[in-house]
Amino acid sequence: MTDKRAVILLSGGLDSATVVAMAKAEGYSCYTMSFDYGQRHRAELNAAARVARDLGVVEHKVIGLNLDGIGGSALTDSNIDVPEAPSEGIPVTYVPARNTVFLSLALGWAEVLEARDIFIGVNAVDYSGYPDCRPEFVEAFERMANLATKAGVEGQGFRIQAPLQNMSKAQIVQAGMARGVDYSLTVSCYQADDDGRACGKCDSCRLRADGFKAAGVEDPTRYFSKVF
């Protein structure tokens, strides 16, 4: 293998689109992976496909999972309302073990591709408080990846890269703009409609809108309602 390959988790949202652009700017051949996991905001899958095309990735995979069969999250269980105000502690929009599952499948693909880098757009500054977005989780998963794989045991270790980890949402927006990300293609809303329009009320919408405002960048998000 002569090219520098990376597998990148691409949800279709602002953060993951920025990560794809950052990896590409670093010279990686980008292979993106999205998941149809029973999320109520399935419009993000269409957004992920748009972003992958626009940024010219080598290959984009969509993996089907039934995390809605497990439930326990407002994002996968229609009986749990998506909150419209920030809450204390870990919110009900946390999907149990989601990033662990996603990274595990990305790890498998990376091993097949002989890619040594896996990128994820987690952030621990302007975020919702999910435990699987913290630096401790990313570091622990990397250690596990190099214990649990043939490549890792043979000394061809993996790196889990989280370049947005310590960036504010405004800094993320600015980084993406500098690398040509078209944020109008992305969907971040937890309850976006089928056309990709955002609710303007959930925590993800609030963080996104605040990020554009703080960055001094016009918000390209389409809303079906907005309370900010």
From Swiss-Prot:
Binding site for ATP: 10-20
A biological process term (GO) from this entry: queuosine biosynthetic process
Pathway: Purine metabolism; 7-cyano-7-deazaguanine biosynthesis
Enzyme nomenclature, EC number: 6.3.4.20
GO MF assignments: ATP binding; ligase activity, forming carbon-nitrogen bonds; zinc ion binding
Positions that bind Zn(2+): 189, 199, 202, 205
Cofactor: Zn(2+)
Disulfide bonds: none
Top-level taxon: Bacteria
Assigned keywords, A-Z: ATP-binding, Ligase, Metal-binding, Nucleotide-binding, Queuosine biosynthesis, Zinc
Enzyme class name: ligase
InterPro entries linked to this entry: QueC (IPR018317), Rossmann-like_a/b/a_fold (IPR014729)
Signal peptide range: none
Catalytic function, reaction form: 7-carboxy-7-deazaguanine + NH4(+) + ATP = 7-cyano-7-deazaguanine + ADP + phosphate + H2O + H(+)
Cofactor comment: Binds 1 zinc ion per subunit.
Similarity comment: Belongs to the QueC family.
Function: Catalyzes the ATP-dependent conversion of 7-carboxy-7-deazaguanine (CDG) to 7-cyano-7-deazaguanine (preQ(0)).
Protein name: 7-cyano-7-deazaguanine synthase
